[in-house]
């Protein structure tokens, strides 16, 4: 049979595949037992291709092969093909592809990273020198000064990566700063057909801007002067200014395809990166169906830290993505910088707004006619309220400021539509869901964004002015005030930042932390204007963007600094240091606020809090986790042996793991339990944790407890005495609830924390208790 497969394989090499273009086929990622390859096949590629040749349909071609973080291949298959492959004795799993999407300066200073400090994280880590951060994104614009290699030493000897040259990306585009650049489009082209190279680059070059922006946040060099359209003037710098960068382009016009993302993980690990930064996400699925979770496990198994964006689905609950416990999941917070652009109404009222519009402004001494898109005649109301394409009547918009509701199309696109229809300016109003969270945009006309309450105020003014015969027609102007520093309160949890609880494993608190993600200045390509709309002919070396996409590379860069300062720390130890030293108060000394509501935020919004780089360098204790600990976690999550092999490439003894504990006993730096309560009763559980001393020898840590409301919490022992650095000690946390009666379907979440303190360091872990009364 093997000889027949090999002969058939030779035939298929010269036969074009039709299944890739079949409307009934999808891309699948196939996990194979690579040890089972028959000796007759010279490579795994030959073996995989011969297996495909045995399928009933026209034999498909392989898109990617994987041999580092995952063993197998991806191919375009019909559901019948996929089912047939799953019956193959050496096929472990067949995973349908998911299409992911992007989660789209002053932040180093806000984080306390100053190049002038003589004894800080930057100095201790030599600014991240010789560590390589792999950025899986939309590529890179290598000519930007953020990627200049002046002053850097030779490329690290360990580096095995390449700079893939093309017509628009010469090999010389890489240097001692940008040490590698690759692109992966097989999955994209398998679904969409051959790329249109007039609209995007078939190379590592960035045609979107997102990848250039995130790469420079993580490791851009110091650049002065830096600004965009006159805003945020100052020094631009990444978190790890001397770290090296490798760009892995996986995102294209229609999205980021799992088969390409997994290929990027596979290649990045083989190339020798130290940190992987991923500002991409999709729908939460079980980990064994999640290509990002699978790729990330393969990376951390090799000692590579993986930072991933939490998503921009906030402020609603259960919106967090990239939730596997071996990834560090990053939400977004604000910094102490703002770009006020306020609306002055004809009745004298001022409405706060933000904008980074940099063109000719409105006449400050003049008031302009004001209209609401949703009340214009001739439209359907809904479309015109959102200022969608084709919804506005130029005769009713020309020469006026137009109020548009946020949603459906991008904020910058709304401005382009208003401008095309003759509008002089635009105000974007948040809806109830977005609340008061504001994002500054580089608009193509004078424009600003206001919160939900401000939008209501403006609509009310327009309505009352239009109805009153005695009053004048509604008017307004926009007053641009430039850049404002020292904003209080800050940080605040950004409105868009995705929230917990963790929809896949509520016992693992996600997001882990938040980092700067609102109105972040970073490098930008020449391909596209700062607004992102195609008609924007302005060009700038830097741009201001917002999203957890921007927060993630902050943590990626910080991880590189910590890895450089502590080369022996594992990815879990680095995450533990970030989590247990995070803070939850703002620069006014008050609990961090939720931007969307103006109320106090919670652990479901920020995880353990906002990262504190200086304290993370010296956390005292860390909660370390091995690959086998994660396997036990998966066993206790009731994953099958096949599921676990798909993720970890290892066989699992789940009988032993399940006897040893429960899913909450993963040695994570936070604690979360979900009680399913039936009637009025007391509930209890316990957590077992082990901490490693990375502080001082002969140190003693004592416990401090703030129990969640309605619970009793004890810790045994109450004191941990360490004789040496590297010593490990264990403790048990016991949680008991009081009798609480909930109505059917109700959920009650209470939070507290435990702190191990040696008098100098506070090792803080949040403790979350969730009570659910089933229907």
UniProtKB/Swiss-Prot annotation:
Its EC number is 3.4.21.-. One of its GO terms (molecular function) is serine-type endopeptidase activity. Glycans are attached at residues 196, 599, 638, 762. Keywords: Autocatalytic cleavage, Glycoprotein, Hydrolase, Protease, Secreted, Serine protease, Signal, Zymogen. The keyword Acyltransferase does not apply. The active site is at residues 137, 210, 549. InterPro entries: PA_domain, Peptidase_S8/S53_dom, Peptidase_S8/S53_dom_sf, Peptidase_S8_Ser-AS, Peptidase_S8_subtilisin-rel, Peptidases_S8_3, S8pro/Inhibitor_I9, S8pro/Inhibitor_I9_sf. It is an enzyme of class 3 (hydrolase). Gene3D superfamilies: 2.60.40.2310, 3.50.30.30, Peptidase S8 propeptide/proteinase inhibitor I9 (3.30.70.80), Peptidase S8/S53 domain (3.40.50.200). GO terms for cellular component: extracellular region. One of its GO terms (biological process) is proteolysis. CDD domains: PA_subtilisin_like (cd02120), Peptidases_S8_3 (cd04852). Residues 367-459 form the PA domain. PROSITE patterns: SUBTILASE (PS51892), SUBTILASE_SER (PS00138). Belongs to the peptidase S8 family. This is Subtilisin-like protease SBT1.5. The gene is SBT1.5.
């Amino acid at each position: 049979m093997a000889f027949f497969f090999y002969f058939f394989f030779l035939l298929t090499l010269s036969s074009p595949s039709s299944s890739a273009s079949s409307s009934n086929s999808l891309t699948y990622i196939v996990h194979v037992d690579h040890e089972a390859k028959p000796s007759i096949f010279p490579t795994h590629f030959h073996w995989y291709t011969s297996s495909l040749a045995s399928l009933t349909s026209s034999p498909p071609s392989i898109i990617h092969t994987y041999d580092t973080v995952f063993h197998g291949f991806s191919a375009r298959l019909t559901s019948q093909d996929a089912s047939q492959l799953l019956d193959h004795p050496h096929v472990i799993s067949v995973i349908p592809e998911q299409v992911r999407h992007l989660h789209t300066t002053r932040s180093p200073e806000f984080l306390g990273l100053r190049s002038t400090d003589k004894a800080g994280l930057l100095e201790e880590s030599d600014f991240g020198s010789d560590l390589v951060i792999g950025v899986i994104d939309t590529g890179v614009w290598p000519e930007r000064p953020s990627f200049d290699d002046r002053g850097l030493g030779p490329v690290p000897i360990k580096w095995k990566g390449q700079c893939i040259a093309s017509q628009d990306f010469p090999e010389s585009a890489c240097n001692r700063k940008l040490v590698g650049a690759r692109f992966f489009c097989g999955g994209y082209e398998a679904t969409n057909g051959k790329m249109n190279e007039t609209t995007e680059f078939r190379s590592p070059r960035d045609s979107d801007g997102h990848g250039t922006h995130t790469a420079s946040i993580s490791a851009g060099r110091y650049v002065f002067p830096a600004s965009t359209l006159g805003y945020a003037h100052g020094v631009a710098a990444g978190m790890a200014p001397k770290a090296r960068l490798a760009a892995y382009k996986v995102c294209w016009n229609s999205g980021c395809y799992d088969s390409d993302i997994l290929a990027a993980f596979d290649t990045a690990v083989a190339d020798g990166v130290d940190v992987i930064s991923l500002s991409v996400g999709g729908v939460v699925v079980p980990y064994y169906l999640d290509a990002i979770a699978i790729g990330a496990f393969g990376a951390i198994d090799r000692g590579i830290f993986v930072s991933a964006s939490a998503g921009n689905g906030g402020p609603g609950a259960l919106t967090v993505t990239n939730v596997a416990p071996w990834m560090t999941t990053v939400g977004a917070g604000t910094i102490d910088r703002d770009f006020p652009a306020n609306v002055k109404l004809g009745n004298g009222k001022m409405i706060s707004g933000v904008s980074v519009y940099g063109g000719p402004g409105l006449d400050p001494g003049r008031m302009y006619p004001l209209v609401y898109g949703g009340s214009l005649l001739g439209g359907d109301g809904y479309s015109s309220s959102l200022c969608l394409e084709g919804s506005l009547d130029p005769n009713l918009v020309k020469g006026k400021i137009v109020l548009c509701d946020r949603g459906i199309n991008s904020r910058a696109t709304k401005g382009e539509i208003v401008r095309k229809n003759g509008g002089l300016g635009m105000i974007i109003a948040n809806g109830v869901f977005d609340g008061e969270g504001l994002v500054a945009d580089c608009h193509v006309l004078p424009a600003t964004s206001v919160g939900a309450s401000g939008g209501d105020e403006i609509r009310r003014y327009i309505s009352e002015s239009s109805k009153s015969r005695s009053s004048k027609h509604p008017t307004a102007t926009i007053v641009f005030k430039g850049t404002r520093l020292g904003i209080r309160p800050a940080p605040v949890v950004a409105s868009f930042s995705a929230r917990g609880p963790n929809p896949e494993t509520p016992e693992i608190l996600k997001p882990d932390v938040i980092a700067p993600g609102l109105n972040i200045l970073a490098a930008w390509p020449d391909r596209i204007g700062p607004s992102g709309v195609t008609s924007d002919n302005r060009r700038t070396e830097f741009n201001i963007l917002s999203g957890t996409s921007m927060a993630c590379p902050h943590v990626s860069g910080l991880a590189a600094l910590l890895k450089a300062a502590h080369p022996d720390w594992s990815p879990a130890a680095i995450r533990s240091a970030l989590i247990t030293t995070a803070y939850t108060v703002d620069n006014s000394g008050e609990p961090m606020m939720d931007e969307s509501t103006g109320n106090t935020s919670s652990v479901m919004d920020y995880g353990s809090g906002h990262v504190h780089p200086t304290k993370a360098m010296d956390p005292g204790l860390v909660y370390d986790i091995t690959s086998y600990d994660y396997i036990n976690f998966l066993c206790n999550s009731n994953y099958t042996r096949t599921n676990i092999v798909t993720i970890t490439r290892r066989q699992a003894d789940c009988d032993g793991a399940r006897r040893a504990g429960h899913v909450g006993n993963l040695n994570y730096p936070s604690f979360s339990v979900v009680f399913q309560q039936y009637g009025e009763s007391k509930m209890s559980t316990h957590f077992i944790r082990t901490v490693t001393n990375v502080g001082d020898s002969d140190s003693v840590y004592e416990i401090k407890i703030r129990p969640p409301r309605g619970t009793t919490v004890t810790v045994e022992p109450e004191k941990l005495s360490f004789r040496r650095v590297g010593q490990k000690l264990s403790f048990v946390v016991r949680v008991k609830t009081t009798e609480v009666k909930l109505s059917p379907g109700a959920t009650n979440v209470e939070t507290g924390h435990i702190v191990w303190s040696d008098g100098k360091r506070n090792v803080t872990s949040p403790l979350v208790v969730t009570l659910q009364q089933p229907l």
